[in-house]
Amino acid sequence: MAVQTPRQRLANAKFNKNNEKYRKYGKKKEGKTEKTAPVISKTWLGILLFLLVGGGVLQLISYIL
């Protein structure tokens, strides 16, 4: 192994100081968001959709006849 110059020693110390933060925990992950549950459940959404579409179909049938 070669002998380090003072400039290399300072550069290595600076590099180690910056990387010491991430060695224990890893780099911070940004941009990930937590998934939240929908405001209304799928069951209630299906019931509401059935009522709206079914009501519209009945209106069309009564309008045609």
Curated annotation (Swiss-Prot):
Transmembrane segments: 45-65
A GO CC annotation given for this chain: endoplasmic reticulum membrane
Species for this entry: Saccharomyces cerevisiae (strain ATCC 204508 / S288c)
Note: Present with 846 molecules/cell in log phase SD medium.
Alphabetical keyword list: Endoplasmic reticulum, Membrane, Transmembrane, Transmembrane helix, Unfolded protein response
Function according to Swiss-Prot or TrEMBL: Interacts with target proteins during their translocation into the lumen of the endoplasmic reticulum. Protects unfolded target proteins against degradation during ER stress. May facilitate glycosylation of target proteins after termination of ER stress.
Lineage: Eukaryota, Fungi, Dikarya, Ascomycota, Saccharomycotina
Family classification: Belongs to the RAMP4 family.
UniProt xrefs under InterPro entries: ER_stress-assoc
GO biological process: endoplasmic reticulum unfolded protein response; protein secretion
Membrane topology designation: Single-pass membrane protein
UniProt-annotated location(s): Membrane; Endoplasmic reticulum membrane
Protein's recorded name: Protein YSY6
